[in-house]
Amino acid sequence: MPSTYAHRRFGADVLVQLPRELREKITPYRPLYDMGLHGPDLMFYYRALQSNPVNRLGNAMHEQPGRVFFTRARGVVNTARNKNAALAYALGFVCHFALDSTCHPYVERYTRESGVSHCEIETEFDNQLMREDGLDPMHFFTAGHIRPNREFAKIIASFYENVTADETYGAMRGMVRVHHLLQATSPVKRWVVLTALKAAGTYDVMHGLVANLQPNPRCEASDKELEALYQQALPLAVRLITEYVEGLSNGAPLDKAYDHTFGEF
């Protein structure tokens, strides 16, 4: 998964390229679209420090072809009481899939070649994008667009099997908390966070999510390639979104792009 800022920025870039009528459907439900931009990653944050069925689902979904989720999502949108609200979440999710499926094969290859962790590669790319946008990676709160809300949680939960609205709300709150925790705004806090991760036994998995004080030179090549892949994914997302909306009414088969997982294959 390109990390939080990349998905957030990508979704905003896609939105301005969509047809006006579709933008007008999404805009009143922008918080749901914004949460959809993080796809199944949202579920990672439900009681994130301990393994449980909800956060394991987030991992499992990354290994499934996209069509598994998006086939189910068609039914959810078409039967929703508030169709546009459900649609906004689903279309944000399409953005997540387009960026993940485009970038992840490269990220996994570069991880093997460079020895830099998957998370660190993506966090470094996030930081590079923030610097390009005139933001300070050490102080900009990348999850500021996530707005925990029980009504939103009910809508989002309907897209997942065996996940309740309360669990979804907990995942939303968890996402905000974890991002606050891992935001190392000073060298001292960075040391405290990394020490805490070691004590909790989660250092190997999570340390790459803590921003480096200076760019990692080993990620210069990956930053450049991921920037190119990001641009490549933009027209893919616009096309998949447009076709997905059309398919809600005409039942056309999902694009072959959805044969790819959210991960490497």
Stretches found by the model and what they are:
Residues M1-A90, A98-F265:
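N-terminal leader/auxiliary helical segments
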Residues C95:
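Aromatic-lined, polymer-binding surfaces characteristic
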